[in-house]
């Protein structure tokens, strides 16, 4: 909600929904949450020809729960997810996937169009440095300032040298 305030989009707070508080217990039972319920309902207003694009980061519990609530939405959505590792990677020990393995199995196995942004082996190569944050973000708008200051603070906290760069995922 803070990001919506920074974007001066208070109007979107009414259509911003809380997600799940737990992970899936199995591959058959959804975790009910306002976010999953809204996604299941909202996706029904779209068609295979004009699908709803769903962008997700972190654990994929909400999307998997929506698919369990209304399996027919698989033909009405295109899921873009930052999670899992690249197919050539030797393992799939990745934070977002590990949080909810059952949800990962659902989204990969349901037949929905999926654009995976693999963490290790792909997104791990997307990095940005402090000078880049300062040059490209600071002074553009309140949201850019917030994100740049936050990322610079985090980068400095974890940096092992004066000069650093960090991966730009969630």
What are these regions (language model features)?
Residues 1-170:
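N-terminal acidic, glycine/proline-rich low-complexity segments
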């Amino acid at each position: 909600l803070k990001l919506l305030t920074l974007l001066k989009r208070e109007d979107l707070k009414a259509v911003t929904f809380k997600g799940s508080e737990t992970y899936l217990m199995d591959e058959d039972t959804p975790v009910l949450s306002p976010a999953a319920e809204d996604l299941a309902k909202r996706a029904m207003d779209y068609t295979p020809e004009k699908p709803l694009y769903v962008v997700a980061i972190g654990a994929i519990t909400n999307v998997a729960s929506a698919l369990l609530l209304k399996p027919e939405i698989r033909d009405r959505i295109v899921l873009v997810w930052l999670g899992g590792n690249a197919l050539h990677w030797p393992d799939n020990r990745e934070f977002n996937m590990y949080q909810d393995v059952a949800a990962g199995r659902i989204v990969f196995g349901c037949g929905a169009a999926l654009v995976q942004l693999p963490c290790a082996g792909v997104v791990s190569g997307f990095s940005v440095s402090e000078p880049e944050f300062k040059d490209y973000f600071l002074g553009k708008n309140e949201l850019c300032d917030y994100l740049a200051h936050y990322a610079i603070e985090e980068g400095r906290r974890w940096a092992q040298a004066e000069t650093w760069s960090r991966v730009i995922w969630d």
